[in-house]
Design a protein with these regions (language model features):
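Short loop/turn motifs that connect adjacent beta-strands in outer-membrane beta-barrel proteins
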Residues: 21-33, 77-86, 123-133, 165-173, ...
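Outer-membrane beta-barrel transmembrane domain signature
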Residues: 176-244
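Outer-membrane pore/translocation modules
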Residues: 97-198
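Predominantly the C-terminal beta-signal and adjacent terminal strand-loop region
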Residues: 230-287
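Hydrophobic, lipid-facing positions within transmembrane beta-strands of outer-membrane proteins
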Residues: 68-74, 114-118, 154-160, 193-199, ...
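Surface-exposed strand-loop-strand hairpins of Gram-negative outer-membrane beta-barrel proteins
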Residues: 42-69, 99-106
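Hydrophobic h-region of N-terminal signal peptides that target proteins for export
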Residues: 10-18
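Transmembrane beta-strands of outer-membrane beta-barrel pores
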Residues: 36-47, 80, 91-97, 138-146, ...
């Protein structure tokens, strides 16, 4: 925890110095950005499947299932000249309910995450519509509930590195070093060091149609303890196309991919989802 304390103190001093420098700037803005409040849902309902188990028509003998996931992604964005400070809350939770015709229904989680983060960036240089400079970040990563007898994830994560940001398309593109303090398992608290690259991109194809992507790749370099479920590599990526339906309501297809490998496993685990999402996306200028 000593490393974490030193890092956070440095981040606060960094942010305070920048804020003091920009205090006299006239172009300060504070925005509440609702990046996405969304619902992803699909339902398959099959009636009288028992009578059609010998049918060559798969649709008549399939298992009924429900898939639903909710996403809440907001940020309080402060900009003052070269200084940018974002405080964000990301939450998602989803379940899949499977109902075979001759068995009891089963429910499994397909998503569960709560991420509270604060990010400070400073533009030392500006070129071609890009801002470039140092960035620091602190985050707390946890879950709504436990599943299948496993403990609830609890991780404090800090990043420091360089970033391109505040561009019309490249909202954030960063390369950082990472320090994690993982206290998911009681009695097995672990400190980890990693390298991470991440992005948040938005492209306006035409009025009312926007393509967006966000994600990260994290490579772990060292650990204070051996915990077989700790990840060695972790990739998460989302690609979404939003089309305005009415006002700030959008609908569109999305692709989500997660691939990772744990220390105690020889093969990669992955999760690939394609679907349609309904979203509410807007922003409110506070200053």
């Amino acid at each position: 925890m000593k490393k974490l304390s030193v890092f956070l103190l440095g981040a606060l001093m960094f942010g305070g110095a920048i804020a003091a420098e920009d205090a006299g700037a006239s172009d300060a803005s504070l925005t509440l950005a609702v990046r996405r409040i969304g619902l992803e849902w699909s339902k398959t309902e099959v009636n009288h499947a028992a009578e059609y188990q010998n049918s060559p028509v798969s649709a008549l003998k399939a298992d009924s299932q429900d898939f639903i996931k909710g996403v809440f992604d907001t940020a309080l964005e402060y900009n003052n000249n070269r200084f940018q400070w974002d405080n964000s809350l990301f939450m998602e939770y989803g379940e899949t309910k499977l109902k075979p015709y001759n068995e009891s229904a089963t429910v499994s989680e397909n998503a569960d995450d709560i991420l509270l983060s604060s990010n400070l960036s400073y533009a030392c240089w500006e070129f071609s519509g890009f801002k470039f400079g140092p960035t620091v970040r602190g985050a707390y990563d946890t879950e709504f509930k436990t599943a299948d007898g496993t403990p609830r994830q609890n991780i404090i994560r800090t990043n420091a590195g360089i970033s391109l940001f505040d561009n019309e398309i490249v909202k954030s593109l960063y390369l950082t070093g990472v320090y994690e303090y993982d206290f998911t398992y009681a009695g097995e608290q672990t400190s980890k060091l990693a390298a991470e690259i991440g992005w948040r991109l938005e492209y306006q194809i035409r009025e009312g149609v926007k393509l967006s992507s966000n994600g990260y790749y994290r490579e772990y370099l060292s650990y204070s303890e051996f915990v077989k479920t700790d990840l060695e590599r972790d990739l998460s990526a989302i690609l979404r196309l939003d089309t305005n339906l009415w006002g700030d309501l959008t609908m569109g297809p999305y692709v989500q991919y997660r691939r990772a490998r744990a220390r105690g496993v020889d093969v990669y685990g992955s999760n690939f989802i394609m679907g349609i999402s309904f979203n509410y996306i807007t922003s409110f200028g506070l200053i």
